[in-house]
Amino acid sequence: MLYKFETKASRVKGLSFHPTRPWILASLHSGSIHLYDYRIKTLLEKFDEHEGPVRGINFHMTQPLFVSGGDDYKIKVWNYKQRRCLFTLKGHKDYIRSVEFHREAPWIVSSSDDMVIRIWNWQSRTCIAELNGHNHYVMSALFHPKDDLVVSASLDQTIRIWDISGLKKKMTTVKPYRENDPMRLQDELFGTDISVRLSLEGHDRGVNWASFHPTQPYIVSASDDHQVKLWRMNDPIVDTFRGHYNNVSCALFHPRQDLIISNSEDKTIRVWDIIKKSTVHMIRRDHDRFWTLASHPNQNLFAAGHDSGMIVFKLERERPLFVQNGDSGVFFLKKKNFNSFDFQAGRTVSLFHISKLPSNNGTQTMSYNQTERAILVSSDAEGGSYHLYKIPPKDSNTVNTKKGTGVAAIFVGRDRFAVLDKGNNVVIRDLENEEIKRCQIPFTIDWIYPSGSPGTILIQSEDKIHMFDIQQKKMLCEIQVHGVRYVIWSKDRNYVAFLTRDFIVLANKKLEQICMIHETVLPKSGVWDDNGVFIYSTSNHLKYLLQNGDNGTIRTLESTIYITGVKNNKVFAIDREFKNRIIEIDTTEYVLKLSLLQQNYNQVMTILRENRLVGKAIIAYLQKKGYPDVVHFVKDDRTRFNLALDAGNIDIALSSAKILDDKDCWNRLGVEALKQGNYQVVEMAYSRTSEFDRLSFLYLLVGNLSTLKKMISYESSDIMSRFHFSLYLGDVEERIKILQEAGLHQLAYITASIHGLTEKAESIGNLITSDGKSQLPQLPKQSYLLVPPSPINCNPNELNWPLLTTTKSVSDVMGENRFGVEQSTSTPTGDWESDEDIFSEGKSQQQSSQQQQQQQQKGDWEEDILIGDGNNGGGDDGGWERDDLKGLEKIGTDGFNNKQNDHVALFVPPQPGPSFSMIWARNSQFAVDHIAAGSFESAMNILNSQIGAVNFDPIKSMFMNIFMATRSSLGCNASTPSLLMPIQRKSAAPYITYGLGHLIERLKTNAYKSTTEGKFNDALSHFTYILHTIIFCSVDNKQEVNELKDLINICREYILGIKIELQRKELSIGAQKDSTLGRQAELAAYFTHCNLDPSHLILSLRSAMNCAYKVKHFNLAASFARRLISLNPNPDLATQAKKVFNFAQQTPTPSDIQQLNYDERNPFVICAHSYVPIYKGSPLIKCPYCSSCYLPTHKGKVCSVCQISEIGKDVQGLQVITIQK
């Protein structure tokens, strides 16, 4: 059996798989409903509305609904998309045991302890039928998958089959009765809608579960008489399966095989063979009773709920056993037949038959020797074995078979194969199965794989893959990859892909890592295509991976497949039903990316011109890679506008903005045009958005005063804008006029007076004093003439800023040669311009340059060629003449100015490669390497997935130390900045300063010393520092990894114990110290159960003995004294302990003494948050990093010991860097 997912929660009473998505619902005894994604192992949602245990749960087959029933007598229908309960069905009068949706009708069937089965219409939200007949609790009621039947199981020791065809007919047929017709009432009271077809009796005690077979007329039942029974609806024969030794909780049929699965309160799951009536598999748990089972409606997945959560599992591996037959096809084993599938013919041929299948429970491998046409099959199940088959010729059915024992076997040469035996040796054998050579490897071998070089194999050991030379018996190279599951070589054997559970690593044949990507879904299979692209599959997608790390999705898969080959745009695969499939794929996306990587711009332009862009993702990719000219190939105007702005192409952005005519587009276009100094476009953008203030200022800057004057009359309603315009123009009379229109006559008078407009000032003054009350304002003593500055450049043809010349883009270079002369393969010399020559972007400059070049060419032609001369072809071949001109021998060339030579090509610097920080982050799966690279966010994500880290404040300083310690500053000249040089270890990874030796030294010299001296706060800081530093450590071998794990346990025990002791001391000096003596004694007692060094355990026992003595718990004091004496303390302390022990033996503990929450005879662990004991068998959760124990109520909080991780979070586990010295 294979575990796929496991949860830790309260007791699970009900389970249901979603029919299409990788989800499972679990109803808990605590009253909560949990929705999990078992593929990514994550809790998605919680639903908490029931009061009391929830025993029934079921997904709807097509709608986004599920139904639940609990001990609160309520049936609730939920919508998981809306994340809420839609409605509640009430009618049962006791606990509800099971609920289920009908596959077609809008019905729900429910069973209850009120001895009634009810059928509900969830659309009308009413009960449409009651099934009465059982005289005890009805434990389950289920619909038949196809027929109109219901099966129920009850504690009255019977199983009933109910016929509901009458109910279905009644609910789907319109009755010809009126609402108050007496015949209608008679039909409802005495109609035979539901009848009992069968009542099955045979169990000696109550029946807990009964369910139908998906296709056969069978029923399976589980009972408290420890038996599982198989009933036949058309046959009185009953089969009984015995083996459980406690109540059987649930039983169901395997949907595709002749198997029955049952679970029981005896803490086992058993798989029964219907034919042989015997147990074929069994899962046993030590402390958890099983309560429920569920099977996936479409996949070979099962789930079981137990006391502390649930498990999702498979009975056996579903991966078909296959091996590639070069490029032409694939060999695969189906049942007991070896078959061959030809890619070109698309036909399957049976090769030969074998007598026994290899076990499918372990890891199976198949290797093919194309020269000798031999197939090697190995399995590590049942101790490991291998079989060697030689494919017989067409005219023979005899198969030459050799077999032997070994964990794994692969071909390593034309007539040699390697076997990994149980003794950790690699044995080389010939095709006659005779041993040729035996290689002893100095370290533990986990598995062996084929290698790309002849005479070598790949050896997997711990977190590394080694290449081993069989002849020389030595390691050639290695690569660090954790948990490799599959190794796939390219066709030319130059590249290899390593598939792990979470990563895909590409390397060359020297095992030098090329790239590594993280994959959230388990990679299933993969092959290399002819272009060097790795095509791989997950359970839901077909994907690709380039050697630079770029990856993407090719298409979605309806079911899981295993890729066997790739040719052009066809992917060949085999599914779990052993069917060979040919899948057409669109290779445009990865061919485009590959062409860019190989700088094959012809192919890139072909794809772009044919409009084969997949979507916005490709456009964003090209833009990210530095190809902004992709804007020429985009048709969507908004996307085209955005790309043009990013590329700084104002002309294309302007044309798109005119089509879109959106205010936001014009605003953005105006900002970009202003940056480039494009006056015309800025003017148009401001006009379209009616930003007249900005437009007027623009006119002032460029000196366009005539248009600015027109704006004054245009903005006649806005006095303030007109006044600003008059200030820009320096028009005093217009200013006075505007002030008068605004009623500001005094300001108008002052303006006219100081500008010397005497007549205008007098008329305004008379207007002011005409009422006889107002006086003329006092004129300023000093005044300045407000004249706007004159623009520097008033030439309307030169308002736009000149732009720098740029290099020609890929599309320009390819486009120039589209209809012209074909490019020469030789290097251009002399005055011929190459593709890297710069060109002018200004339209006027480009036209003048072309005219000048045409005029120059025209003049040269007129001087050298006589049009109409019949000999202008020259030579016999019709080539150009090369006649020597006489009389020019003594003439020099000084003074001739070749302007073309002055046109120096702009140097185009090469694109910078990836920095060392990028390489560190890209090539590593360790958080410490990402920290050294400065990629703190990805490091936090890795730590969250590995140890559940959520609080990074305590380790912030370590992040900065690691980041700074991997860089050295190299001083240069005074005028140049310093150079940062990386400090690296092997394989282009940063050097990590934290090591095991440093931590052990600090443990001994600081942490233990402070604890002995009673400086608990100092000791706490030392142990916490060590616990935090372990996350970032690098070690040399697996032994040191184990030492790190021991160090984590030591730090956890000391931190917990010190915190308990500090709280006890805090209570002992508080205002209520006398009232907390009992709690102080409890804390002192808990401290003695921390796994401390004997010298420190002596001190904790002394403290606990004194506390117990003070609160008169003499029996506990005697117990602590006994433990203290057994540790051989110093004589004084031993004498004191003996006195306490003798006194406690003579003096009984008072009966009215306060009882302590402490039982030394019952094993327990201490809750690190509440400091109370968690006795053996009680539910608990742990910190995913330091493994501190907590009560379940503290789930989701930050661990009190390590102060980093989230309590109870499911994680992958800490990965530590191992450096082979």
Swiss-Prot record:
Q: Which InterPro entries match?
A: Beta-prop_COPA/B_2nd, Coatomer_alpha_WD-assoc_reg, Coatomer_asu, Coatomer_asu_C, Coatomer_complex_subunit, G-protein_beta_WD-40_rep, TPR_COPA_B, WD40/YVTN_repeat-like_dom_sf
Membrane topology note: Peripheral membrane protein
The record's WD repeats, renumbered to this chain, cover 7-46, 49-88, 91-130, 133-172, 202-241, 243-282, 285-323, 358-399, 528-567, 910-953
Q: Which domain of life is it from?
A: Eukaryota
Q: Where in the cell is it found?
A: Cytoplasm; Golgi apparatus membrane
Q: Which GO terms describe its cellular component?
A: COPI vesicle coat; Golgi membrane
Keywords attached to this Swiss-Prot or TrEMBL record, sorted alphabetically, are: Cytoplasm, ER-Golgi transport, Golgi apparatus, Membrane, Protein transport, Repeat, Transport, WD repeat
> Assembly state and interactors?
Oligomeric complex that consists of at least the alpha, beta, beta', gamma, delta, epsilon and zeta subunits.
Please report the name of this protein according to its UniProt entry.
Answer: Coatomer subunit alpha
Please name the source species. Answer: Dictyostelium discoideum (Social amoeba)
